[in-house]
Amino acid sequence: MAKIYRETDADLSELKGKVIAVLGYGIQGRSWALNMRDSGLRVIVGVRPGKSRDLAKEEGFETYDVAEATKMADVVAVLLPDMVQPKVWTSEIGPNLKPGALVIFAHGFNIRYNLIKPPSNIDVTLVAPKAPGKAVRDEYLRGWGVPALVAVHQDYTGKALRRALAVAKANGFTRVGVIETTFAEETETDLIGEQTVLVGGLMELIKKGFETMIELGYQPEVAYFEVLNEAKLIMDLIWERGVYGMLNGVSETARYGGLTVGPYVLDNSVKERMRKAAERVRNGEFAREWLNEYEGGMKNLSRMLNEVKNHRLEVVGEDLRRLMRSGR
């Protein structure tokens, strides 16, 4: 059974008098910085000159270059894009960390695949909200929060978990619940979920359904509504009620058809391919492939994005979305 930490398991006094540097001021970084400041903590922002730094200044933060912010900080939240982190770590973060500093990542990718190798005299932890950055801020302001994961990779001070939980509490995560995990589990499940279900799986399922209906002679606009537009309604039901609750929220015809035809379309061969995709994540093959793609200028990614952009599903969808917005 998973260990879940809540409000009474975390103490903000662990961070009293400490300087917290949020590195990066994108959607996630901004939300963390604002939340922790509103929780009474001293927060500075490390970010390069540009629009993000200007925004941080406008919102009342002391801003510094990443290296300078790291030097000043007792707690360093690394909220830069994953693929930017290793280079910035080598040149600006790693050489400037105080002994005993707490470093927090929001995703375990670079630690899991040894792209960042931290020194032995710091604490290294993970605090990973399971929601987009905007929701992290919005739910905090609502007096609630979003669920998160916490993990300890390195505990130099003996206080790594306590301090990470304090950061989680300052962001509102312990109001909902913070699940203890490992860097490996967080990273692998995140990638496997994205590839096989959330991004890759859903996208391809919708595309294949759309293509099938078009090939059978149905109107593209009608097919779009059936396979994409209504997918949100079903996912909302699943999110609110679970899969069983969703089934009780649709018609008996939909319920029977889904339960009998769904396993035929997505049979155990799909699960076998999911396992193969998962193994590529677990053995590092996907990480190596993605790193090569990134360092090579992401030409394959650009090509694939253009293919999606020009797919008939997107062309039809753009027109229909414009039509639906026109009445607002």
Swiss-Prot record:
Cofactor(s) demanded: Mg(2+)
Function summary: Involved in the biosynthesis of branched-chain amino acids (BCAA). Catalyzes an alkyl-migration followed by a ketol-acid reduction of (S)-2-acetolactate (S2AL) to yield (R)-2,3-dihydroxy-isovalerate. In the isomerase reaction, S2AL is rearranged via a Mg-dependent methyl migration to produce 3-hydroxy-3-methyl-2-ketobutyrate (HMKB). In the reductase reaction, this 2-ketoacid undergoes a metal-dependent reduction by NADPH to yield (R)-2,3-dihydroxy-isovalerate.
Cysteine disulfide links: none
Pfam families xrefs: KARI_C, KARI_N
Classification via PROSITE patterns: KARI_C, KARI_N
The gene coding this protein: ilvC
Originating species: Caldivirga maquilingensis (strain ATCC 700844 / DSM 13496 / JCM 10307 / IC-167)
HAMAP family registered for this protein in UniProt: IlvC
Record's protein name: Ketol-acid reductoisomerase (NADP(+))
